[in-house]
């Protein structure tokens, strides 16, 4: 049956190739536009760490001005980072499986003169648990031990590109890298790792590159290192670095791993008890509003996917519907031109159902051809987006989006062909038999 319907559809398409090509192009254009913008939305809103996103939680606490909330436009909103003093205290908990605060810093690397000139890097100042939390893959070596956090010991993890630049991509574990005024021993080298979106710290761009080097957090003290990301506060930051660390400035991203509901409840109780203790000391005087946000909820709060992306996706789907509706008239004219032939077939015993299925199948063949054309055009569209917009993210078609394009093509073919197929199968054979 299917082979017969396919032969009939191909024969019909060949009968008027120009008109058939016009219909295919119409569906192809609609598929191209819709697939392009659905793909951008899909990739921007994808889960960056699906195997453990439900056990990673971003910690938020409200240390803001008692007289005025963090965001007047969003009642209940709290600062999206925490203070250094709060990080130190809550990291004393042994409830989380893994935990750690981190921030982005700007430092200079001084390679040997024969290798390269000194260059500036973006560093992630973090604890050993950072790597256990977010699972960046290692090419050489491994994470530094937790004991190195306390010293802190002069150990470093390099990203793939920095290792290429300094050591030509060779195993550099055990070798030294000079950062600022200190020599650090390489503990590990990452494989290429660019989580998209950059969920662990999206504050300066959810699609920016991951950091180039990773260092123990407490080196911020000897260097008096300030964050290269966002820093907010409602009080004076102090006159020196020590006062800055003790201030109400928020600039640290705090994550914990809680693998069970029991852990989560216990940790929430711990945070509430900590905040209540701070209230007695005259801090955190706003209503207690601690938050533990899983990865996808955190990304939603940070509005990682811009509203424009959602709007463009919806508009592109409407454009596809318009393309399909505009093809109804063309298909209707094409089918009705064969009305005498269909009248004879009906008189010879062909059922309405058979005629309807034949023409619907032809529309779906057109839809599939248009879908194939649309996928090719969407590849060009995504390439144009990658070229025009300078972000550290490459939009590409994956298997899900190709399948979505195929599904949309079939739906578009059905929308365009349903009414014309119904009209042609409803003709009265007697009218055309008289004409014959």
Q: Positions of the model-derived regions?
A:
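C-terminal membrane-exit region of the final transmembrane helix in multipass inner-membrane proteins
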Residues: 33, 401-436
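Short, strongly hydrophobic transmembrane alpha-helices
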Residues: 16-50
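Membrane-helix entry/capping segments
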Residues: 3-4, 11, 15, 275-315, ...
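Mid-to-C-terminal secondary-structure elements
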Residues: 128-143, 154-302
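Hydrophobic alpha-helical transmembrane segments
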Residues: 20-21, 312, 376, 399-407
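Transmembrane alpha-helical interface segments in multi-pass membrane proteins
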Residues: 325, 332, 340-386, 403-412, ...
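Membrane-proximal extracellular/periplasmic loop immediately following the first transmembrane helix
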Residues: 37-111, 117, 248-253
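Short acidic/polar micro-motifs at solvent-exposed secondary-structure junctions
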Residues: 63-80, 101-129, 144-156, 178, ...
């Amino acid at each position: 049956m299917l082979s017969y319907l396919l032969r009939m559809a191909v024969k019909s398409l060949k009968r008027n190739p120009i008109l058939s090509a016009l219909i295919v192009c119409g569906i192809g254009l609609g598929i191209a536009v819709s697939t392009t913008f659905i793909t951008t939305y899909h990739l921007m809103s994808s889960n960056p760490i699906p195997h453990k996103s439900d056990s990673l939680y971003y910690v938020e606490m409200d240390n803001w001005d008692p007289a005025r909330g963090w965001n007047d436009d969003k009642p209940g909103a709290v600062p999206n980072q925490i203070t250094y003093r709060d990080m130190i205290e809550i990291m004393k908990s042994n409830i989380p499986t893994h935990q750690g605060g981190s921030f982005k810093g700007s430092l200079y690397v001084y390679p040997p003169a024969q290798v390269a000139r000194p260059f500036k890097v973006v560093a992630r100042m973090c604890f050993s648990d950072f790597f256990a939390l977010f699972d960046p893959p290692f090419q050489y070596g491994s994470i530094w031990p937790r004991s190195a956090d306390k010293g802190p010991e002069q150990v470093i993890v390099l990203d793939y590109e920095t290792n290429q630049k300094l050591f030509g991509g060779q195993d550099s574990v055990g070798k030294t890298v000079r950062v600022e005024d200190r020599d650090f021993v390489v503990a590990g080298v990452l494989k290429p790792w660019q989580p998209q979106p950059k969920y662990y710290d999206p504050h300066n761009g959810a699609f920016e590159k991951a950091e180039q080097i990773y260092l123990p957090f407490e080196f911020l003290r000897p260097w008096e290192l300030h964050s290269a990301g966002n820093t907010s506060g409602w009080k004076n930051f102090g006159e020196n670095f020590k006062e800055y660390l003790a201030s109400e400035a928020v600039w640290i991203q705090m994550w914990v791993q809680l693998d069970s509901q029991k852990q989560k409840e216990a940790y929430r109780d711990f945070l509430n008890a900590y905040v209540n203790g701070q209230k007695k000391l005259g801090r955190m005087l706003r209503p207690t509003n601690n938050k533990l946000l899983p990865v996808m909820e955190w990304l939603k709060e940070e509005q990682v996917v811009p509203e424009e992306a959602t709007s463009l996706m919806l508009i592109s789907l409407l454009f596809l519907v318009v393309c399909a509706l505009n093809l109804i008239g063309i298909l209707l004219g094409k089918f009705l031109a064969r009305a005498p032939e269909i009248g004879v077939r009906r008189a010879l015993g062909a059922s309405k159902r058979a005629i309807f299925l034949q023409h619907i199948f032809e529309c779906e063949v057109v839809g599939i051809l248009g879908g194939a054309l649309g996928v090719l055009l969407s590849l060009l569209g995504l390439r144009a987006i990658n070229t025009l917009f300078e972000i550290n993210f490459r939009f590409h078609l994956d298997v899900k989006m190709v399948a979505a394009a195929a599904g949309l093509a079939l739906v578009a073919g059905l929308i365009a062909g349903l009414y014309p197929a119904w009209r042609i199968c409803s003709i009265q054979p007697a009218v055309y038999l008289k004409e014959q």
